[in-house]
């Protein structure tokens, strides 16, 4: 990261950037495959940190810990903040010298109105209902969803 006081960088792997091994790790549905998907996110984090800082997380014991609310942090590198998200075959990670949060959502089929009722404020619900097309509603809802998830992950509240 440079010498900037507040800096964060986002890294991601898309399906076309991943090896067959990565693809198997992130596209699974069983509990074990989901754990492997999570480990893939941490491998991306380790790759980022090794490239930018020459820290080798894989050689550090218990390198990633969690706060009481579940927010992950680097035990030996408290000056670095990170967050990981995965959805579908995508993995994203943000790394910075300030607290960070990130969320990505694959635009899968969902029950739009039912989901919107759960996550939208009254004003957001009004806007959602005014959107004219199904695609527009879906885009709006996923945008709201990812912003809220990112914020929760940034603050570490109720993760």
Sequence positions of predicted segments:
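Core catalytic alpha/beta fold that binds nucleotide/phospho-ligands
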Residues: 1-159
């Amino acid at each position: 990261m440079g010498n900037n006081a507040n800096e964060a960088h986002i890294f991601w792997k898309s399906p076309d950037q991943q090896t067959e091994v990565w693809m198997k790790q992130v596209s699974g549905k069983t509990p074990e495959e989901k754990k492997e998907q999570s480990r893939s996110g941490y491998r991306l984090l380790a790759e980022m940190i090794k490239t930018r800082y020459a820290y080798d997380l894989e050689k550090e014991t218990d390198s990633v810990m969690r706060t009481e609310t579940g927010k992950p942090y680097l035990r030996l590198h408290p000056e670095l903040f990170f967050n990981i998200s995965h959805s579908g075959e995508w993995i994203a990670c943000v790394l910075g010298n300030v607290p960070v949060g990130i969320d990505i959502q694959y635009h899968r089929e969902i029950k739009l109105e039912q989901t919107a009722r759960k996550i939208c404020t009254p004003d957001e619900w009004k806007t959602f209902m005014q959107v004219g097309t199904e695609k527009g509603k879906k885009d709006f809802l996923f945008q709201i969803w990812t912003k809220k998830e990112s914020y929760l992950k940034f603050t570490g509240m109720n993760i």
